[in-house]
């Protein structure tokens, strides 16, 4: 089965970019055995089935992707969206068209729904007019869960009960997202290695691509970034997970530092005229270093929603930015990847 396994691994990487190494091989072998048994075929025949049956290939990929996520993950980046990026884009747009936001690799929907809730707290019911939210993932199973929008306690790590009661209805041991939030996100299958995407997956102002690139090697990450650029408007912004950002500085897009946070910008980005915002041109020689694994626990990251829910502190009441001398610089931060 070793030669068949190697061929299957190569097929998976070619079609969707997933690199299966080390511990992932055990998961692959288990999935292959289970699927061969379910189809009543020999494991040696499974590769041929994968090549000819797109639905079966998707079923296998669904079993190989890890979809651990939760609401208001990395709240400082959501704060960046609500307090900085969204107001800036909306001011430039002057109400002519909604701001399009993509959650790429959205898993079961916690990320895009978190973005909706955070923006609803600031803009109220105007969110439906001001924004267009899309969630995309290669895993059709988790997309079905996202559309269903029913969650367990596991998705609310550190999220205060007031948030759940405001945006969710409790049903036995689960929480069902309220319709006014659920209806604002449209979910679509998204293969980031595909050469072309449908119109609904194009022309985004802001793309969140967080905690996904850890599954890909450096060449694949660069290809994915190049494909994401194609989905962005000329002044679009790409937000990558905090622990992944510097390892994704691959020469595709300029890296921006704003108030101690990093994101990538395309073309002539909408940047504030402040000394705390710096734009660095693309690297000419990307760093080959692997992505560092985040060690911060969920409990150490208070949910962004805690600062935004009705009756609590509004964005205008948030503490002032960190003093300039306490903010990381691009130079010092990049040393982490060398």
Positions of PLM-derived features:
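Core SAM-dependent methyltransferase catalytic element
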Residues: 253-318
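Conserved beta-strand signature within the Rossmann-like core of class I S-adenosyl-L-methionine
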Residues: 234-242
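A short glycine-rich, Lys/Arg-flanked "PGG" loop and its adjoining helix->strand segment in the class I
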Residues: 222-234
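Conserved class I S-adenosyl-L-methionine
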Residues: 97-109, 114, 132-134
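Extended basic-aromatic, gly/pro-enriched interface segments that bind polyanionic ligands
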Residues: 104, 125-208, 212-216, 220, ...
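Alpha-helical segment of the N-proximal tetratricopeptide repeat
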Residues: 328-338
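Conserved SAM-binding loop of SAM-dependent methyltransferases across substrates and taxa
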Residues: 108-126
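Conserved AdoMet
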Residues: 1-102
């Amino acid at each position: 089965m070793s030669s068949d396994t190697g061929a299957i691994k190569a097929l998976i990487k070619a079609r969707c970019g997933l690199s299966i190494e080390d511990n992932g091989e055990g998961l692959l072998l288990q999935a292959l055995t289970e699927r061969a048994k379910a189809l009543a075929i020999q494991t040696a025949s499974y590769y041929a089935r994968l090549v000819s049956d797109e639905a079966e290939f998707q079923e296998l990929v669904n079993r190989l992707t890890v979809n651990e996520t939760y609401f208001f993950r990395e709240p400082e980046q959501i704060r960046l969206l609500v307090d900085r990026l969204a107001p800036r884009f909306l001011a430039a747009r002057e109400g002519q068209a909604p701001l399009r936001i993509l959650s790429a690799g959205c898993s079961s929907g916690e990320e895009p729904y978190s973005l909706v809730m955070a923006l609803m707290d600031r803009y109220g019911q105007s969110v439906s007019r001001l924004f267009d939210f899309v969630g995309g993932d290669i895993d059709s199973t988790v997309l079905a869960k996202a559309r269903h929008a029913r969650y367990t306690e596991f998705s609310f790590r550190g999220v205060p009960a007031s948030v759940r009661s405001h945006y969710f209805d409790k049903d036995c041991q689960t929480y069902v997202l309220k319709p006014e939030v659920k209806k604002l996100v449209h979910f679509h299958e998204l293969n980031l290695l595909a050469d072309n995407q449908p119109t609904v997956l194009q022309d985004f102002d802001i793309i969140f691509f967080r905690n996904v690139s850890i599954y890909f090697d450096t060449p694949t990450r660069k290809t994915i970034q190049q494909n994401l650029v194609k989905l962005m408007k000329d002044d679009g912004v790409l937000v990558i997970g905090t622990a992944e950002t510097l390892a994704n500085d691959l020469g595709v897009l300029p890296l921006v530092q704003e108030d101690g946070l990093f994101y990538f910008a395309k073309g002539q980005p909408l940047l504030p005229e402040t000394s705390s915002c710096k734009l660095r041109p693309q690297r000419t020689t990307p760093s080959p270093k692997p992505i560092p694994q985040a060690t911060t626990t969920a409990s150490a990251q208070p949910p962004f929603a805690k600062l935004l829910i009705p009756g609590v502190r509004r964005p205008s009441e948030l503490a002032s930015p960190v003093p300039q001398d306490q903010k990381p610089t691009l130079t010092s931060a990049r040393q982490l990847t060398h």
